[in-house]
Amino acid sequence: MSESAVPADIIMQPFAKLSEESLKLAVESLNELKIPNTTLASTTAEQQQQQQQQQQPPSSSTTKEGGATTTQDNKLTANGGTTADNNNNKPMVINKLDYLPIIKSNIWDESYGWLTTIPNSESFAQIIGTTIKEGKDIKKTLYILDPKQLKESFNLLGLDQQENSIDTNEMIYKIEEEMMMQGIFKILFKLDKKTLESFCRDLKIQIKDDMGALCDSIMSTMYDLEESPDTTTTAAATTTTTTTTAAVPPPPTTTTTTTTTTPTIASTPTVVPPTNTTTTTSTTSPIPSTTPLTNTTSIAAATTTTTTTPTDNSGTNSPNKETTPSKAKKGVPKKAPTKKQPATKSPTTETAGIVPTTTTTPPQATTTTTTTTPPTNIIAPKTNSTIISPPTEAPSKPAPKTSKSQATTTTTTTTVQSTTKNTEKSQNLTNTEQPKKKLRSSLDKPSSDKPLTPTLPGKRERKPLPLDPVHLQPEQKSKPGSGSAQSASTAKPTPTTTTTTTTTTKPKSTIAKTSTSTTIKSKPTTKKKETTKIITNGKRKRKQDNNNGNEEAAAEEQEEEEEEDNSNGIQNNNSSNDVEINSENESDREQNDNFSNFGSSNGNGNGLLSEDDDDDDDDDNNNNIMDYQSTASSEIKGYYTHDRKWICPSFDYIKKGIERGFLQNNFNLSDLLEYCKIHDLPKNKTKTKTIKIILDFVETGTAPQQTSKPKKLVGKAAAKKKLQDQQELASS
């Protein structure tokens, strides 16, 4: 872990990206809380001097005070003096950077305050103390500790949950990092609402009323703005410089070949054989061969496109240095990042990374493919040739990560000056694509001033807050009509059998009839049939969809059913005159048991009042009353009357669980629709909207107006209604 990668410096980066107004509001809010070291006057002269030196360019002049001398880079000399800016005598203007030390000081105070109040950390508090105010002091103190004590401190902070073997530097880094995270989180909770809203506007996040959720969102967004020092270090280490010198090429013994031997085909009709020879395609004379190429950067004339192809003395290829281009999309050439050049007719190709890519230039330019990646610091002679090869399949293994010894760039440009810039740009793009750093999650939201419970950095992830406090679980019961539609489409009946699918739905009192069980007897035929049983209002109806579509036969069969029902009278589901196979009888019992999920064991409702209670007193001992046992709960959720009418629970029962989740998990849509019908509430086809209607009705006590149109009657129901209207008209 490098010395510059102090967690405080990394974590303070997002604060520097906030607006000056937000930082000013934060400092003012901290001043109102009277946290130590939060006033502008507390900014020491040394901190002001450091800020001024950071803003001062390297070439600015400095003054001498007390015999102190400074270099041109504003660094102190060995005599231990101090430096001052030329403008130090002018009145100090508070700018954005002056607020950062104040905020950082408060964060450290909160960090150490949290550190010394961790449960069971008396020994750790004695080791660290409470007077440390700078990040370097904690690092220095931790390095003095015995390895055993350091490990004990690391364990007390809860940072060893998933770490088996970790060195001392990593332990110290994680301790500092966790402290800073805790400090920032506690500071956010002490800021006022106005400051937090300003933070949200700068970070472009949604303002929330929940304080914990708002601070967690700010922490998550600020973490994403942190920049890892590893990225800049790698980029600086892998930057190449192009130099052009007029010298004789080095001896052949110091070069290695990296040319692939794959057979290549040019974009023109010319075919390049799989040999070490190269084909030159240029419109003007290239640069003389006496100009060597440094750091594997190709330099060409204004209208010449050249690819570096180093060869050894024997003219053979080095097998260990062979590189395969990456696979491009069929018909679409893969473009590498390039820098805009002045308007010329020569192509500019720039390839970044270790694995070379294929770039196709406009039709008037020559197509160039970069296929070499020599090691760093190997000087290869420039060749006046252009290698054109089609894209081949990418290697099965992924390309290795960029390192200091392997990260080189091969660039083909038109001028020497632009080559260096393009090379640096391409390598910076390559390094930014690498993983940023290890994840560090947010902290637990504090419910009070008690210390937070730390967990392991790098292994945690922020947990998103639920949008709704009521967690709605998916309905486990089958939705009405869903089983029949699905089974009817997937059934595969044989020529001599009939496929039967059973679906359970809630009864509706509007279409209840006296018959308890009706069955359409199907004759075995060679035609395919699909039969669907639907339980509605306690009465089984069989709906047949015959391929011939004979509606008259269905009407005749339905009339026969009614005559049979009239002769048999009201019957129980358990005793039916239908002759069916044993599997259908078993399904009958299953359907009867399904009612027990909603009903009670008697017909009087166990104290629940309904519209038909007065009429049901004489029918309590009737043998035709169905007995449905409640298996899910001892509480009454509704029941059926003797005429198969479903009675929904009363208001008192629903008020027990007025939450949306209670209605969602314990009632089907048909239950809720029946409830809406009894209390003259609007009906809706979706369960969510129906629940909302019921909840609004229970809270307000008034039923909204009916907006839906009355259902249009069809078939026998329409004829019956018409007959009743005629009779009423005749009687009047």
UniProtKB/Swiss-Prot annotation:
Annotated region (Disordered), positions in chain: 38-90, 226-629
Ranges of compositional bias, category Basic residues: 327-338
Chain intervals with Polar residues compositional bias: 57-76
Entry superkingdom: Eukaryota
Acidic residues biased stretches: 553-566, 610-621
Compositionally biased region (Low complexity): 47-56, 77-89, 231-247, 254-318, 339-383, 401-421, 487-523, 567-577, 593-609
Protein name from the UniProt record: Uncharacterized protein DDB_G0290587
Protein's organism: Dictyostelium discoideum (Social amoeba)
